[in-house]
Amino acid sequence: MGNESGEWIMHGINWDNPDCIHSVDEAIKYINGFGFLPLFKNDIDGFSLEERTVPEYWWSDNPEIDPWMWRAIIAKRHDIVYGKFFDKKAGFISKKWLPVFANYRRDGYDFDALYDDGKAPNKHKKIMVNFMEDNADSEIYSNELKKQAGFGKDGEKGFDGAITNLMMQTYLCNCDFKKRVNKRGIEYGWDVAVYSSIEHIYGYDYVTSCYKDNPQDSWKQIVDYMHEMYPEATDKQIRKLLK
C-alpha cells in the first residue's frame, strides 16, 4: 500500500492470476509454505500478502475475500503469529520459523533477563509483567493493557511504540481482535486488538528452542533464505525489513 499524490493505492493482482490468494485458507497455506510474510507492500517486490490478493476486496467486510479480515482470522487461530514484525509494520510468522526469529530478535534473552541486564526500559517491563509468571497465558485487550501497565494521561507515555518494539523483539503478538464488552455483557464498538505473549501461542520450550544457537547464525539463516527466495532483494532491503 503506497501513498501516491495524497491517495492510498493498493498493489495487487487479478482474481484469475495463478499467483492470486483467494481465501484465508489459501493465505494460511502460503504463509506456512514460505514461512513469514509482511501484510503490506514493501521494498522487496512481491513480498507481501497485499501483492498476492485482489486490491478491490480489501476492507470489503466479507471474510470470504477480504484480506484485512483474514489477518484477524489468522491471529485468532493461533497457528501463525501476527503482529508488527517487519520494520515495525504488520505481518505473519509461521510456527516453523518463529524460533529462528525469536533467537535473533531477542538476542537469546527472555524478557526478564533482558530487563535485569539493563537492556529494556521500565515502560516495557510495566507491559510485560502482565504476560509473565502467573500471567503467562493472559490475553488482554489493548485498552485494558494500557490501563493496567500505567500508561495514559497521568502515567507513562508511548504505549503504542512500546507495544511495537516488544512485537519486533517477538515477545508479544496480536492473538485476536474482538469487540469490547460493556458491564451488561453486550459487545460494542470496533474490534480491538488483543495481545498475548508468543509463548502463550506456542509454549515456552518451542519458542526458545533456538536459544542454543548463536543469534547471528539465526540472522544468517533468515538472510540466506531470503536471497534464495528473492534473489533480486539486496542486503540493505532485507536488513531494513527483517532486522
Question: Where are the regions that the model predicts?
Answer:
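Long, low-complexity intrinsically disordered regions
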Residues: 1-243
